[in-house]
Amino acid sequence: MVKNLIFWLVITVVLMSVFQNFNSSDTSNHRVDYSTFLSEVNQDQVREAYINGRIISVTKKDSSKYITYIPINDPKLLDNLLTKNVKIVGEIPEEPSLLISIFISWFPMLLLIGVWIFFMRQMQMGGGKGAMSFGKSKARMLSEDQIQTTFADVAGCDEAKEEVSELVEYLKEPSRFQKLGGKIPKGILMVGPPGTGKTLLAKAIAGEAKVPFFTISGSDFVEMFVGVGASRVRDMFEHARKSAPCIIFIDEIDAVGRQRGAGLGGGHDEREQTLNQMLVEMDGFDGNEGVILIAATNRPDVLDPALLRPGRFDRQVIVALPDVRGRKQILKVHMRKVPLSEDVDPMIIARGTPGFSGADLANLVNEAALFAARFNNRVVSMIHFEKAKDKIMMGSERRSMVMSDFQKESTAYHEAGHVIIGRLVPDHDPAHKVTIIPRGQALGITFFLPESDILSISRQKLESQISTLYGGRLAEEIIYGSQNVSTGAFNDIKVATNLARNMVTQWGFSDKLGPLLYAEEEGEVFLGRSVAKAKHMSDETARIIDEEVKLLIEVNYNRARKILNENLDILHAMKDALIKYETIDSLQIDDLMERREVRKPKGWLEVDQKKDI
């Protein structure tokens, strides 16, 4: 930036000097022709003549001034001026040096050449952003000193760390493996849901192995020009071979490694050329000794089979969502820099966050710290973690949203219906918290929290979920009548319908159709799959599927209606508690379900006293 500024500053100064040289003559006076000047001299109208080369600055006796130019050498001019008593002032004209004359005459050409050289250098040395550097790799190389991440910073994925530890040992001591004839994997594909730590694990590998680390995103290869992607792949591997042993990390490789085929775009699009070049570089005629490729994706199903074969990606490392022990370890890592209260127990938080990824847990700790700072607390306590968890799971509170009394009551009945059905149907997750404070896009939320990590779901649990989903709509129908049911159950109906259809078509939970797969394969044409869809079922089978889905819904809908009709007193009591407290937790729900007096929420008295003051 500074060099560019200096360059243009020099150009500006030179241009100003040249134009000043061209316009150095005095142009403040108007110009007259030479014959007029001679005539005025003869008429005795001129008082003074200032001669500078061929330029004469004339001052008349009436004090007016002008300039004139001598077209040819006039030897009689001085005699005429002396005869008429004209004051003559002369000056020897300053002749420009030969170098300056040459420079002025050649300056336009030199300027064009300089500008051309400048732009060419910008194109070639513009940090990969110029037109001449389109084919250069955009991979950033991080040296061993720049990577501070180690395996100590990675938690919750012990199996994945164990899988890649051999890679680190090979990079440190390759001879130990080579003398036994062993070959280190050429490539490792890390697969897992978003936020589980795939990129972090790759950085830890490079940090532990102390080798150069090239990092690039899958979307950085392909751009608007044909052939750029393949050229960048070649350039990247060429630089990597010079730095071997080293690691190349490609994040989101599904952007460039998607399955080839006859999808939209044909078989000769730019992405496929890039993928073909990558396949050749990974396992072609030219060896890549010491160059290890690590890639990460959360869409392994869309990758090309040629990319996944042994010799290219020899290993697939699954980086799954952490279990309760893994979540505890991850929380401890992120809590290192946070001042914690004595009541904070990572295990309790880990048990209450099933399904959270490493990124979710990092966000949880950060949100808790922000809540503590907002309340001017010096340490982060469990209350802050609870508020942060509610915000992440249920969305931010919208207390500024104004709801009428009827809307509050209707929402309270709706959420109470979900809670009651969820508590009384078999094999359902316990209700953790229910609120009628608008959060996100919802007017109220009932949050069910599983007691442990869910690995598979039984048919009974699925049917219980369907019944619970319809509990809110049924509560409104029972209290206000079928004509006054609101649209608040739209999402509940959508989720319940999808569950029932999957039970029939994918999971084999239909007695009439049996354990067969009836769902049509949804091939995405942009992933190199066929545009045409084959129909895998007859019209009669499709009709039976619709009947079975409807039957599942009706059975569980009627079960939920019966449960609510038998527990109307609990429904009314829970509605009253929700309107009074706005949010109730699992302990208050227990009181309501046991038909006991509802205990007050923690801190309720303090809040109430503040309001009275």
Swiss-Prot record:
Task: Give TM regions.
Answer: 5-25, 99-119
Cofactor note (record): Binds 1 zinc ion per subunit.
InterPro entries given in the database record: AAA+_ATPase, AAA_lid_3, ATPase_AAA_core, ATPase_AAA_CS, FtsH, P-loop_NTPase, Pept_M41_FtsH_extracell, Peptidase_M41
Q: Which EC number(s) are documented for this chain?
A: 3.4.24.-
* One cellular-component annotation, GO: plasma membrane
The EC category is hydrolase
Residue ranges in the Cytoplasmic topological domain are 1-4, 120-613
Name used for this protein in its record: ATP-dependent zinc metalloprotease FtsH
Needed cofactors: Zn(2+)
Classification via SMART domains: AAA (SM00382)
How this chain sits in the membrane, per its record, is: Multi-pass membrane protein
The record's similarity note reads: In the central section; belongs to the AAA ATPase family.
Q: Which residues lie on this side of the membrane: Extracellular?
A: 26-98
Q: Name one GO biological process term.
A: proteolysis
Q: Locate the residues binding Zn(2+).
A: H414, H418, D492
For this protein, the record's CDD domains field holds:
RecA-like_FtsH (cd19501)
The alphabetized UniProt keywords are:
ATP-binding, Cell membrane, Hydrolase, Membrane, Metal-binding, Metalloprotease, Nucleotide-binding, Protease, Transmembrane, Transmembrane helix, Zinc
Chief location bin = membrane
Subunit description: Homohexamer.
